């Protein structure tokens, strides 16, 4: 069993009780053939990163309703999420996971399975119970794979994201709260965070208790962080 570490978010990030700066780079496991994972992760580490981030595309892992694949036995091993995270840990990297249901990521349908469209006028990314029923079915399978990978259980996963850039899409906070609760009920006990564009109306659309806010931007960092500071309750500023 791996040594147990602790990770906390207070006025800054703390790893094993010591201040810790997350330097993260994104590398999505399903976009790189598994035989190249180690090489690419080592290159990420050589850049100075101590953490790798990846989204989890729902449509990759449940291409048909009720048919799940996390084994890596299909698609040339690209579905082996657990193997990827464990490899990152072996190479000395921490991990941040963004486990759907919507990922954006310039990925087909934002990661949603196409079969969702067969369910009439169901409203995606809302608290529509028809939609949430499908998310719940997916999470009941997904979360048991993710829970053992958390830092609290000897794994490398520091944090997990809820939804993605939701404040630019809607303001259904009940939806975000339900996703948060589903993850907690699925055994996720690491900090949960949100990632949104740095604007007041966007943060106000999506702010939910117990979710750490981060900003998503590519330039004008000071302006972005000044806005984020209004909503992160004195916590660390993070571009995620």
Regions found by a protein language model. Name each.
Residues 30, 57-61, 199:
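Short active-site-proximal "capping" loops at secondary-structure junctions
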Residues 2-3, 97, 101-134, 142-240:
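Substrate-binding/catalytic cleft of secreted carbohydrate-active enzymes
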Residues 34, 38, 75-82, 129-136, ...:
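Non-membrane alpha-helical structural segments and their capping/turn regions in soluble enzymes
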Residues 37-108, 179-185, 189-190, 207-209:
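Aromatic-lined substrate-binding rim segments of carbohydrate-active enzymes
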Residues 29-31, 73, 214-218:
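Short, flexible loop segments at the rims of nucleotide/cofactor-binding pockets, characterized by
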Residues 1-53, 86:
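N-terminal carbohydrate-binding accessory modules
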Residues 27, 56-59, 164, 217:
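Residues that line or immediately flank small-molecule/substrate-binding pockets and catalytic motifs
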Residues 139:
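Short amphipathic alpha-helical/adjacent loop interface patches that line ligand
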């Amino acid at each position: 069993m791996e040594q147990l570490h602790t990770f906390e978010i207070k006025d800054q990030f703390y790893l094993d009780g010591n201040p810790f700066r997350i330097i993260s780079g994104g590398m999505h496991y399903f976009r790189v053939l598994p035989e190249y994972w180690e090489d690419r992760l080592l290159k990420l580490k050589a850049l100075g990163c101590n953490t790798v981030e990846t989204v989890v595309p729902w449509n990759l892992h449940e291409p048909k309703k009720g048919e799940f694949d996390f084994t890596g036995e299909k698609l040339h091993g690209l579905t082996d999420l657990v193997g990827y995270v464990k490899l990152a840990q072996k190479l000395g990297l921490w991990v941040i996971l963004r486990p759907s249901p919507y990922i954006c990521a310039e990925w087909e349908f934002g990661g949603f399975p196409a079969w969702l469209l067969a369910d009439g006028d169901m409203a995606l990314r809302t608290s529509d119970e028809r939609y949430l029923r499908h998310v719940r079915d997916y999470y009941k399978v997904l979360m048991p794979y993710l829970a053992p990978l958390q830092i609290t259980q000897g794994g490398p996963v520091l944090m997990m994201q809820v939804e993605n850039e939701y404040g630019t899409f809607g303001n259904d906070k009940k939806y975000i709260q339900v996703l948060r609760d589903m993850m907690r009920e699925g055994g996720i006990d690491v900090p949960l965070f949100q990632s949104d564009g740095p604007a007041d109306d966007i943060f106000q659309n999506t702010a939910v208790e117990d979710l750490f806010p981060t900003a998503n931007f590519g330039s004008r960092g000071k302006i972005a962080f000044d806005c984020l500071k209004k909503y992160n309750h004195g916590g660390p500023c993070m571009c995620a």
